[in-house]
Amino acid sequence: MSVEFFNYHINWKSKAIHPGSHKSDQRGMGIEFAGHSNLLDYPDPRRIDLRMTMRDPMDQVYVRIFNQRSATPIMIFNDLSASMTFGQASKLERAAEIAEIIKNSAYHNRDAIGLVGFHDTVNDEWIAPLSYRPYLTESLIKKITSEKNHNKGSHGISKLHQYLPKDHTLIFFISDFHIPNEQITMFLNNARKHTVVPIILWDKNEYSNLPKFGITTFTDPETFEERTILLRKKLIKNIITEFNQRKKHLIKLFNSFDAPPFFVEGEFNPDDMTHYFNEYYHA
């Protein structure tokens, strides 16, 4: 079975010393020309520029300096709340699949990766710090599908700022974002120095594949309360309208923070994520 991954790039210069695949400010053995320096300041005889040296009236020896390609930190924030258990193939199963592909992509680019899972709180057992050896992140990804956080909400989003890395980080935020707008806005404000990619998991059975008529029982996954309602054409239309309005609002909210959302309402296609980066984050 082939390993799935997508191609991504960043539109800022990494500050990481660790070699990788992205543009950086670090001097090294790269191919991006950064200028000249005196040999005494940058003692690397392999980089002597004879033409520049011969033209200098002060007889100084010059070397060419280049920027190396560096790694960049990658974080996954994964919603583990009760609403993520919805569906015959739950959103958590889809989240685990996507997180695995993100991990593969980071490994392919030689980037450090970490993961934080949350529901109403952030537990220590759901924290994998940034590392170039993604064993802990991988072990948490395998646990995602077994989470059964009935009666758990997503208030832990208000604690995520404590786990934001110091340096500019590419953050993949996996959630259905059935989260109050104020809490989403607060997180985005706290994460302004980072680049956030919201991956929004919705299940069409939540709103579009409802029975056309009849009595049905809904269970709120976060309060665990049951409600019996009579489905009729007008109510179904209202439900669909509300979801469409919610989608428009999320797009507007995330775009206002330069964080275009990526919606997943079925199978996740890594190629679509590659196209997303090509469209929104030019190298």
PLM-predicted stretches and their roles:
Residues 1-25, 166-167, 185-283:
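Von Willebrand factor type A / integrin I
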Residues 1-124, 170-174:
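An amphipathic, basic-hydrophobic helix/alpha-beta surface used to engage anionic
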